[in-house]
Swiss-Prot record:
Family assignment from sequence similarity: Belongs to the universal ribosomal protein uS2 family.
Keywords per UniProt: Ribonucleoprotein, Ribosomal protein
Pfam families reported for this sequence: Ribosomal_S2 (PF00318)
PROSITE patterns found in the cross-reference section: RIBOSOMAL_S2_1, RIBOSOMAL_S2_2
Protein name: Small ribosomal subunit protein uS2
Gene Ontology CC entries for this record: small ribosomal subunit
Taxonomic source organism: Methanococcoides burtonii (strain DSM 6242 / NBRC 107633 / OCM 468 / ACE-M)
Coiled coil spans: none
MF term (GO), any: structural constituent of ribosome
GO biological process: translation
Presence of keyword Ribosomal protein: yes
Cystine crosslinks: none
Entry-linked PANTHER family: 40S RIBOSOMAL PROTEIN SA
SUPFAM superfamilies from the UniProt entry: Ribosomal protein S2
Gene that encodes the chain: rps2
Length: 214
């Protein structure tokens, strides 16, 4: 079962667990909840178990928002050390394509959305060949080809990972609902904003500007 913007449950338990992080979180916890960032799937992998906060009665796994917030902050710091033009962000998933494109536009990165052409990272004669220093993927399952190529040439991989994702070839995980429209736009916006803050460059975008109209 995919996690979408529908069926978002904001529970008293989740809110209570987040109270202690409210003052230091990148956005108010309610914004994470409203966007459904915490909503996982009815499947979980061993890799993602440490990021799971609880299991709902309907079998849906709920992600720990504090972990998401902390990971966005630390990974933004990591990414800020790279030349933005050497950062590649990809998304085969439809709802991730517009946020990924806006991320690249706002920080000066490169985006490849939609179908990823095999060989784009490994074949120098391939049209559209690019040698990034780091890759960001929206979903390790949908963007598996990108990850395979990045691993083959030794490029670190940052991935937005849901409860059902395998992370064996991912270097840095951002635990999040990576299927919902609002969740993806908020996470990509926060990541871009924090990179801009780390690099001390202007960032004049609202979260709503990262949300696809589809």
């Amino acid at each position: 079962m995919e996690n979408t913007d529908q069926n978002i449950e904001i529970t008293a338990e989740t809110s209570a667990a987040a109270e202690n992080t409210e003052s230091t979180s990148l956005v108010p916890i309610d914004e994470y909840l409203a966007a459904g960032v915490h909503i996982g799937t009815q499947q979980k992998t061993q890799n993602m178990m440490k990021f799971v906060y609880r299991v709902r009665t309907d079998g849906l796994y709920v992600l720990d928002i504090q972990s998401t917030d902390e990971r966005i902050r630390s990974i933004a710091h990591f990414l800020s050390m790279y030349d933005p033009s050497r950062i590649l962000v990809v998304s085969a998933r439809q709802y991730g394509q517009y946020p990924a494109t806006m991320f690249s536009k706002s920080v000066g990165a490169v985006s490849k959305v939609g179908r990823f052409i095999p060989g784009s990272l490994t074949n120098p004669v391939q049209e559209g060949f690019f040698e990034p220093d780091v890759v960001i993927v929206t979903d390790p399952a949908g963007d598996a080809q990108v990850i395979r190529e990045a691993v083959n040439v030794g490029i670190p991989v940052v991935a937005l990972c849901d409860t059902n994702n395998m992370t064996s070839n991912v270097d840095l995980v951002i635990p999040t609902n990576n299927k919902g429209r609002k969740a993806l736009s908020l996470v990509y916006w926060l990541l871009a904003r924090e990179i801009a803050n780390e690099r001390d460059i202007p960032f004049n975008y609202e979260a709503s500007e990262f949300e696809t109209g589809l």
